[in-house]
Amino acid sequence: MPNRREFIKSSTLAAGVTALTITSKGERTLKNKNTIFRKKLSECLGGPWPEGGDLKPKIQKTEQKDGYRLIWLSYELEPNDRCPAILLVPDGVSDKSTAPAIAIWHQHAGQWHLGKIEPAGLAGNPMHHTGVALAKLGYVVLCPDALCFEERQDPQKKLTRGNYERFEFLRYTVAGKCMAWKNILDMRRAIDYLVSRPEVKPDNIGCYGHSMGSTHTWLVGPWEPRIKALVGNCCLPTYGAIHRTKLLHCFPNFIPGIHAHGDTPDIAGLIAPRALHLNLGETDGGSPIQEAREGVTSIAKAYAEAGVAENFSSFIEPKTGHVLSEKMWDHVQNFFSKHLL
């Protein structure tokens, strides 16, 4: 018969083995759940994206500004499909003195004539001249046009404004894909371009988006591991909220068949373990706050389960709508400084 000390020792070891077994089973269950949802999400989006080929970049012109320069350029997304963009490079940044980079996904706002030029500080609301603000903080910034906006409107000029956007959404849908699938492809090519730039630190890439740009942020996050830090401002509409409030929203939010398997916060949760921050306005009708709060809790849980609770943060500003407020911007700056600088 074992003595008391031996009994305690053997019991402790057995308990440890049991705990490890339970933990291991829990980790496997979580991994399996995420793998299954990721697979379903990929299928609902439209399947795998084509491998990125030669970007075939072209530079149109360069203009010196106060503390940074603007470079108008384009690069290939797919054969016969190019993306116009503007690159902002801070003074003093070069191939010999590299810097972190941030891609900015512009907003929708029913302003199809505005894409890259708003964050680049050339038009639109000064509140959203975020590319300029980030360049002055020392980041290389890429501002591309999303499909259906600015220079990527109907090339035949037959359909205008929302009609062309609706046409493109339906065209991708009947092909077994969706607008989100195309947006993700285009954003991944934007990251291809950023990491190709000699003045960019390829391991220090972030992205930021307001409104539709926020949707683009949590859409691309699960599929682009080169993005180290992601910020979404004012857009986390859940399907539950959309249905409850009969909310008409940007086409990228609508992924055919996905609601049978999960909701938008579940998509954002797949970004873990990489860093994610979300800003929300309490009175923003585009992200009904009841479900948005639940969504933020769900994402936080996903990060905690992945063992990286510290890599997700959120800020809900009281009595604030669909804006980029000073407090929200403080969170954006501090987040990128923490994770990219």
Which residues fall in each region the model found?
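C-terminal segment of N-terminal export signals and the immediately downstream linker at the start
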Residues: 1, 21-39
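N-terminal export signals
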Residues: 6-27
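N-terminal cap/lid segment of alpha/beta-hydrolase-fold proteins
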Residues: 54-94
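Short beta-strand element of the alpha/beta-hydrolase
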Residues: 97-107
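Cap/lid segment of the alpha/beta-hydrolase catalytic domain
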Residues: 105-185, 242-244
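Mobile cap/lid helix-loop segments that gate and shape the active-site cleft of serine hydrolases
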Residues: 173-174, 189, 228-268, 273, ...
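Alpha/beta-hydrolase fold nucleophile elbow
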Residues: 200-209
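C-terminal catalytic histidine-bearing segment of alpha/beta-hydrolase fold enzymes
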Residues: 297-298, 303-341
